[in-house]
Design a protein with these regions (language model features):
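Short hydrophobic core segments
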Residues: 7-9, 32, 133, 146, ...
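A glycine-rich dinucleotide-binding beta-alpha-beta segment and adjacent secondary-structure elements
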Residues: 129-132, 308-388
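Glycine-rich loop(s) and the adjacent beta-strand/alpha-helix scaffold that form part
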Residues: 157-203
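A conserved short coil-to-beta-strand element within the FAD-binding core of flavoproteins
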Residues: 129-142
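Glycine-rich FAD pyrophosphate-binding loop
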Residues: 23-47
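N-terminal Rossmann-like FAD-binding beta1-loop-alpha1 element of flavoenzymes
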Residues: 4-31, 406-410
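Glycine-rich active-site loop/strand segments that organize a redox cofactor
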Residues: 49-97
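An anion/pyrophosphate-binding glycine-rich loop and adjacent beta-alpha core
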Residues: 36-38, 43-44, 58-59, 94, ...
């Protein structure tokens, strides 16, 4: 039997951060990781650059958490984005802030974040154990450790930091949900979040595959609801199956059960122009070359890859001379550019999602300490909890803030 002050399942962002904080407080800590590699998911976040947080206030982080944001109030009050930045700079990682207040290592290399966390763990006496957690060890209603494939590990504090189900090749297999259920915790429905979407118009999207649009707006609507669910300016990407990119990923966090309702994504390709201003711009372009075919007249206005789609949607003969286009046809063109609508069929599989929506029901977790309300000595931190946010470093902030609250309570 091996005993520690704290034992943590999962060597991801939350698990290693919590281990460092406990080690700094003089606790003996073991981190159990079955994948044989620390921080595997961290290595691929931010396209391999690792968007560690967002350089904003705690209130702004709260606004970027679409569900259960109140649960995070205490944790964010105690460990805000500025604290995350100070932590990594203290470990020798230089940081920079980019567009949208996204914070990255100056090196643009996620490995530097992982190496810093691993070294901080080792320097504070944390032991990494290559083993697979099978079940919790419970005695008299209290968590006492983990029963693993190659042995049992006991501790005064037992911490589940196993992540969600996204990117399972990195070790995120959803084991934490099974552990939570074993002691009576409710686990809300697990679905993809921050995930590309498949559209019914995928054949229209395919020719534009690879096209990245900047400074467009995306509005997400649900059928039979007057008020939009989501509206934001940013970037998006056309794929062979539909839509992706930051705007689409953030909008996906608001998608519900697509068997019960239909969702639409409206893209405004020229949000800086009103309908009247766009019409004037088109008239000017048409006037410059009045004898051009319509299909050859939109190059100044739109990226070439999307022009065939716009022509098809607005229903204007592509070979029609622009000096013959009627006002009604021009209005259809303006409306199409200002509201290019796609119908969401489904999200891509959870394996392709950046994070998981759903998890351990936070109503059964103490928001000040992340301790289970059902089982003393048991804690849940990071993505295993039913809290998720938009892109921009907010999800890693959740991981670090929940881990800090846990360590602060134990330490």
């Amino acid at each position: 039997m091996r005993r520690f002050d704290a034992v943590i399942a999962g060597a991801g962002a939350a698990g290693m951060f919590c281990a460092v904080q406990l080690g700094w407080r003089g606790k003996s800590v073991a981190v159990i990781e079955h994948s044989g590699c620390q921080g595997r998911k961290l290595m691929i976040t931010g396209k391999g650059r690792c968007n560690v947080t967002n350089n904003c206030t705690a209130d702004t982080v709260m606004k970027n958490i679409p569900r259960n944001s109140k649960f995070m109030y205490s944790a964010l009050s105690r460990f805000a984005p500025e604290d995350v930045m100070s932590f990594f700079e203290c470990l020798g990682v230089e940081l920079k802030t980019e567009r949208g207040n996204r914070v990255f290592p100056v090196s643009d290399n996620a490995k530097d974040i992982v190496k810093a966390l691993v070294k901080a763990c080792e320097d504070s006496g944390v032991q990494f154990i290559d083993d697979e957690v099978k079940e919790l060890i419970i005695k008299d209603g209290r968590a006492e450790g983990f029963k693993c494939e190659h042995g049992d590990y006991y501790a005064d504090s037992v911490i589940v930091a196993t992540g969600g189900k996204s990117y399972p090749r990195t070790g995120s297999t959803g084991d934490g949900y099974r552990l939570a259920k074993s002691v009576g915790h409710k686990v809300t429905a697990i679905t993809p979040s921050l995930c590309p979407v498949v559209t019914y118009e995928r054949e229209e999207c395919a020719p534009a595959m690879g096209l990245s649009l900047r400074n467009c707006t995306l509005t997400l609507r649900e059928e039979d609801r007057d008020k939009p669910i989501f509206h934001e300016l940013g970037e998006m990407l056309f794929t062979h199956f539909g839509l992706s990119g930051p705007l689409v990923l953030s909008a996906s966090a608001h998608l519900g059960d697509m068997n019960k309702s239909r969702y639409y994504m409206d893209i405004d390709l020229k949000p800086a122009l009103s309908h009247e201003q766009l019409d004037s711009r088109i008239l000017r372009d048409f006037g410059d070359f009045p004898n051009r075919d319509f299909q050859n007249s939109l190059g100044k206005l739109l990226p070439s890859k999307i022009i065939p789609l716009i022509i098809k949607r607005c229903g204007i003969d592509p070979e029609k001379k622009v000096n013959q286009i009627t006002r009604e046809e021009r209005e259809r063109l303006v409306s199409t550019v200002k509201k290019l609508t796609f119908t969401v069929k489904c999200m891509r599989p959870v394996e392709e999602a950046i994070i998981t929506r759903g998890g351990v029901d936070v109503s059964q977790i103490d928001p000040r300490s992340m301790e289970s309300k059902l089982c003393k000595g048991l804690y849940f931190i990071g993505e295993v909890l039913d809290v998720d946010a938009y892109t921009g470093g907010f999800n890693l902030q959740i991981a670090f803030s929940t881990a800090y609250s846990c360590a602060d309570k134990i330490g």
